[in-house]
Amino acid sequence: MNKLANGPNYKVKPRRRREGKTNYYKRYVYVISKQTRFIVRITNKYVIVQIAKIDPKGDIMIASAHSAELAKKFGWKGDENNTPAAYLTGYLAGLRAIKRGVTECVADIGLHVPSKGNRVFYVIKGAIDAGLKIPIGDISIENDRIKGEHIAKYAEKLKSENSDLYSKLFSRYLQRGLNPENLPSHFEEILNKIKSSGG
């Protein structure tokens, strides 16, 4: 139930907090620390990564990566916001940050809940594997999920049980010419392309 705006002590939260965009307490901590931030945001369609440095005049963007680039530049045929895409976007951002002289960052996951299996940690894992140092504590990362093996297994099972639902759920993959059962090998192909490009 929403708290009603009444009484002399009611305080309106800042606009960006009301919109679910900024956690001002965390923002304050980042500003005080003066460390370079590895910013991860995941929308309903995409994964967005930015590496930014705090500056009194505003954040200075050092490098960035967007999961839409995976399809446009590297031929990715899966969804742009699933776990493998999250890892690949993080890896791409990590390579670009290193290219610009960044070696260490702190993770800024915004208002994402740091729960087990959250895709934000797969983005960070991608950047770490690219060579960036980002402390994430004791978060467990499942390697089979990085490659999309869980998606491939589910697709294989669904195809044999309900082909109509299979075609509906994986329509984007199929339209792009990828059988979702082959996602792990496709992931490896795209990862190698990103490595070869150097970011």
Curated annotation (Swiss-Prot):
Matches recorded under CDD domains: Ribosomal_L18_L5e
GO molecular function terms attached to this record: 5S rRNA binding; structural constituent of ribosome
One of the GO biological process terms: ribosomal large subunit assembly
GO CC term (a single one): cytosolic large ribosomal subunit
Keywords on record: Ribonucleoprotein, Ribosomal protein, RNA-binding, rRNA-binding
Keyword ATP-binding recorded: no
Biological function: This is one of the proteins that bind and probably mediate the attachment of the 5S RNA into the large ribosomal subunit, where it forms part of the central protuberance.
Subunit structure: Part of the 50S ribosomal subunit. Contacts the 5S and 23S rRNAs.
UniProt cross-references to PANTHER family, sorted A to Z: LARGE RIBOSOMAL SUBUNIT PROTEIN UL18, RIBOSOMAL PROTEIN L5-RELATED
Family of this protein: Belongs to the universal ribosomal protein uL18 family.
Name of the protein in question: Large ribosomal subunit protein uL18
Organism: Saccharolobus solfataricus (strain ATCC 35092 / DSM 1617 / JCM 11322 / P2) (Sulfolobus solfataricus)
